[in-house]
């Protein structure tokens, strides 16, 4: 059964759209819409995977962000203080004149690790966030 398609509008930075167009062309998509549908499916799968994090976990949150975004550094710091009881370490790297990389290592309940990552993902100026989790090793 074919689903009804809904038309939406999306505003994207030119550079991001250009890179997306290159990738969908290389992958052989028939249209930009097909590439966007695939990207949304992958986003949903990633979200569902993140939601399934239970029990004690070790997590690594990798964040790439613009350090020019007003208030972003303070917001990231505030979130790290809020989750200070589960954050073991963080590393800050200046990637170039515009971008920084933050790596945050956490250990705690999976839901808390996930919440910390989601809070960072939602901040304006954050370009990329990746959460990787693993067992603490006790059940291995």
Swiss-Prot record:
Q: Which cofactor is recorded for it?
A: Ni(2+)
Q: Which GO terms describe its biological process?
A: response to nickel cation
Q: Which InterPro entries match?
A: Acetolactate_synth/TF_NikR_C, ACT-like_dom_sf, Arc_rbn_hlx_hlx, CopG, CopG/NikR_regulator, Ni_resp_reg_NikR, Ribbon_hlx_hlx, TF_NikR_Ni-bd_C
What are the entry keywords?
Answer: DNA-binding, Metal-binding, Nickel, Transcription, Transcription regulation
Q: Which Pfam families match?
A: NikR_C, RHH_1
The cofactor remark states: Binds 1 nickel ion per subunit.
Supply one GO molecular-function term.
Answer: nickel cation binding
Highest taxon in the source lineage: Archaea
Q: Where does Ni(2+) bind?
A: 81, 92, 94, 100
What NCBIfam families is this protein classified in?
Answer: PRK00630.1, PRK01002.1, PRK02967.1, PRK04460.1
Q: Which family does it belong to?
A: Belongs to the transcriptional regulatory CopG/NikR family.
Q: What does this protein do?
A: Transcriptional regulator.
Protein's name in the database: Putative nickel-responsive regulator
Q: Which species expresses this protein natively?
A: Methanothrix thermoacetophila (strain DSM 6194 / JCM 14653 / NBRC 101360 / PT)
Q: Which lineage do the record's taxonomy fields give for this organism?
A: Archaea, Methanobacteriati, Methanobacteriota, Stenosarchaea group, Methanomicrobia
